[in-house]
Swiss-Prot record:
Lineage per the UniProt record: Bacteria, Pseudomonadati, Pseudomonadota, Alphaproteobacteria, Rhodospirillales
Enzyme Commission designation: 5.4.99.12
Gene: truA
Name of the protein in its database record: tRNA pseudouridine synthase A
Record's subunit section: Homodimer.
Binding site residues for substrate: Y111
Function per UniProt: Formation of pseudouridine at positions 38, 39 and 40 in the anticodon stem and loop of transfer RNAs.
Signal sequence bounds: none
Catalytic activity as recorded in UniProt: uridine(38/39/40) in tRNA = pseudouridine(38/39/40) in tRNA
Length: 245
């Protein structure tokens, strides 16, 4: 039995999220079915971050145990073949120690949020960005974002159905920068609450529009109440970009 570390890229649009659910196709289901077609083994694949419906991944890390003997190149080629036509690609396959676990061994995770900030709609990037027509002040957003960096009670930025035992998280980085017509937000932490990144982005958008100040963000954080913060940004602009071990 060999444990494998898989690095995946996927378009989240056709999926109900990473995790298997009864209401539609999931990334986990697509991957486990591809593995079955390759090995005839029924397995459970674990991932570093269980993304929601419509959320994408540039480098999601997963782990799985396979009894079939094969090289890393063979596993990668077979899974990419059997994953068709799903928009999922296996970028890398590596053999790892039996105690490696994509979720529980993970020391940190990073997300990217993309806002297309222009008047014209998104023709090529529809479903992959949040289209915001009105001008956004990325520098003001970045300044306000620093109020959220560090260890805090993020109750104001967690989903109502969040199952985390504690709302306290340590945000190691939250940066905002304009790149051409895009405003890009990068968030890094050991772990995140459900919807935390999207709720922070929705709040920072209010700052970018000039409707909120950095002090308003601090007050929202201190309130420890979801209704005190901004709206939840759409799933379309969110990407899981990195997991480190």
């Amino acid at each position: 039995m060999q444990r494998w570390k898989l690095t995946l890229e996927y378009d989240g649009r056709p999926f109900v999220g990473w995790q298997r659910q009864d209401n539609g196709p999931s990334v986990q289901q697509a991957l486990e079915e591809a593995i079955y077609r390759f090995t005839q083994e029924t397995v459970t694949v674990f991932c570093a971050g269980r993304t929601d419906a419509g959320v994408h991944a540039l480098a999601m890390v997963a782990s799985v145990d396979l009894a079939r003997e094969a090289t890393a190149d063979k596993v990668q080629a077979a899974l990419n073949f059997h994953l068709k036509p799903h928009p999922v690609a296996v970028l890398r396959v590596e053999p790892v120690a039996p105690d490696f676990h994509a979720r529980f061994s993970c020391l940190g995770r990073a997300y990217l949020y993309r806002i297309l900030n222009r008047r014209a709609p998104a023709a090529l990037e529809a479903g992959r960005v949040w289209h915001v027509q009105g001008g956004l002040d990325a520098e003001a957003m970045h300044e306000a974002a620093q109020r959220l960096v560090g260890q805090h009670d993020f109750s104001s930025f967690r989903a109502s159905l969040c199952q985390a035992k504690s709302p306290v998280k340590t945000l190691s980085d939250l940066s905002v920068a304009r790149v051409g017509e895009e405003v890009r937000i990068v968030a890094r932490a050991r772990s995140f609450l459900h919807h935390q990144v999207r709720n922070m982005v929705g709040t920072l958008k209010l700052v970018g529009e000039g409707r909120w100040t950095a002090d308003d963000v601090s007050r929202a954080l201190a309130a420890r109440n979801r209704s005190a913060a901004g709206p939840t940004a759409p799933a379309a602009g969110l990407y899981f970009t990195e997991a480190w071990y």
